């Protein structure tokens, strides 16, 4: 199936990929072959370059979804007697908190509503009040609603108090600036199937080398031991266990295209244009964004569901899908919403086309009142 014949995925990942990326998966690789090891080495180096971490940090890839790498990072980088502070403003923050509980790491949360970003002053107060906290685990872009948390300011607070910072950058890495030279962090976690526009199945942790060196024996798991994974890769250039060879090759191809496009500035700029086109188009239809624009990431946008008795998300989803676009359900606890992603490999006509498909779907469903405010 050609790219033109496929639906456009307006989701936070998996997302629409290029023909070049998918073509990279047509070749089979031996997992211990020197050519494949060279791909892994090149990929690790390029991922480090995106955050300017060469010389100070190490990139440790890991099989599985991004959550595998989040759990591996918490389990490896936080000692078993460590204490993790999790600022919580959404579903993916809550997932980190659950990981801490499952792994038996002491946990403290700062809880916010889903339409607020993390306040660095709250982190400051929590660290000042409790010297037993050893780590802060922050979600950079909380994909539940699309909130962009102030990473740089929080990193400065954490560094000031001499604690370690672990950043879940799943939905920001490669599109929103993270610079290891100016934003101190112990680890940044991301994955293949997000803003780098690879396919899902591979996560990676970019960790400060001096931090990794102190992590032997921390992990609860053999397969998720980042320290052991890193040491083995450094010694042999190979993966400890069978890697997802096709996914690695696809991500290598995707990162090559990322570099050719112009790197972070170009990728982030494209997503920002998609975001503006989406907001303008949906406002014209009467939809209300869930978030204040000041805290909205240009990655995924949450909209209030239509306030109309004819609206049903399942039918809405299927009708938009028939018109060539895949949306995403809301992930909020108390408000009925749906989400539209701004990321993926598609042209500038993609977002206006999606807005037109949504408008056509509303007409087909007989939805006349998109929001209470619009009707008033």
UniProtKB/Swiss-Prot annotation:
It catalyses: (2-aminoethyl)phosphonate + pyruvate = phosphonoacetaldehyde + L-alanine. It is an enzyme of class 2 (transferase). InterPro entries: Aminotrans_V_dom, NH2EtPonate_pyrv_transaminase, PyrdxlP-dep_Trfase, PyrdxlP-dep_Trfase_major, PyrdxlP-dep_Trfase_small, SP_NH2Trfase/AEP_transaminase. The keyword Methyltransferase does not apply. SUPFAM superfamilies: PLP-dependent transferases (SSF53383). Keywords: Aminotransferase, Pyridoxal phosphate, Pyruvate, Transferase. The keyword Transferase applies. Its cofactor is pyridoxal 5'-phosphate. It comes from the Bacteria. One of its GO terms (biological process) is organic phosphonate catabolic process. Its EC number is 2.6.1.37. The modification N6-(pyridoxal phosphate)lysine is found at residue 194. GO terms for molecular function: 2-aminoethylphosphonate-pyruvate transaminase activity. Gene3D superfamilies: Aspartate Aminotransferase, domain 1 (3.90.1150.10), Type I PLP-dependent aspartate aminotransferase-like (Major domain) (3.40.640.10). Homodimer. NCBIfam families: PhnW-AepZ, PRK13479.1, transamin_PhnW. Involved in phosphonate degradation. Belongs to the class-V pyridoxal-phosphate-dependent aminotransferase family. PhnW subfamily. This is 2-aminoethylphosphonate--pyruvate transaminase 2. The gene is phnW2.
């Amino acid at each position: 199936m050609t790219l033109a014949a496929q639906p456009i995925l307006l989701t936070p990942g998996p997302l629409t990929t290029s023909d070049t990326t998918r073509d990279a998966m047509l070749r089979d690789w031996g997992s211990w072959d020197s050519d494949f090891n060279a791909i892994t080495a090149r990929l690790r180096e390029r991922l480090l370059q995106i955050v300017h971490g060469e010389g100070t940090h190490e990139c440790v890839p890991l099989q599985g979804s991004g959550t595998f790498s989040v759990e591996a990072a918490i389990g490896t980088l936080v000692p078993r007697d460590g204490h993790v502070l999790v600022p919580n403003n959404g579903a993916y923050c809550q997932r980190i908190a659950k990981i801490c509980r499952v792994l038996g790491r002491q946990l403290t949360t700062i809880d916010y509503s889903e339409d607020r970003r993390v306040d660095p002053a709250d982190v400051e107060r929590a660290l000042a009040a409790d010297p037993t906290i050893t780590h802060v685990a922050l979600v950079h872009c909380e994909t539940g609603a699309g909130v962009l948390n102030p990473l740089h300011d929080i990193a400065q607070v954490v560094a000031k108090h001499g604690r370690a910072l672990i950043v879940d950058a799943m939905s920001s890495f490669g599109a929103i600036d993270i610079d290891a030279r100016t934003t101190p962090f112990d680890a940044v976690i991301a994955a293949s199937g997000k803003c780098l526009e690879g396919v899902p199945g591979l996560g990676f942790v970019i960790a400060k080398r001096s931090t990794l060196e102190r992590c032997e024996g921390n992990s609860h798991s053999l397969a998720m031991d980042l320290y052991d994974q890193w040491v083995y890769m450094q010694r042999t250039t190979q993966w400890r266990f069978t890697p997802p060879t096709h996914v690695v090759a696809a991500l290598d191809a995707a990162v090559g295209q990322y570099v050719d496009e112009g790197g972070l500035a170009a990728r982030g700029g494209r997503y920002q244009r998609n975001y503006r086109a989406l907001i303008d188009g949906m406002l014209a239809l009467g939809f209300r964004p869930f978030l204040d624009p000041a805290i909205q990431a240009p990655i995924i946008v949450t909209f209030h569901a239509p306030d109309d008795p004819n609206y049903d998300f399942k039918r809405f989803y299927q009708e938009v899908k028939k018109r060539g676009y895949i949306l995403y359900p809301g992930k909020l606890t108390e408000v009925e919403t749906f989400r539209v992603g701004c990321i993926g490999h598609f042209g500038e006509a993609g977002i206006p086309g999606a807005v037109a498909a949504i408008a056509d779907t509303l007409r087909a469903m007989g939805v006349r009142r998109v929001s209470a405010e619009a009707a008033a």
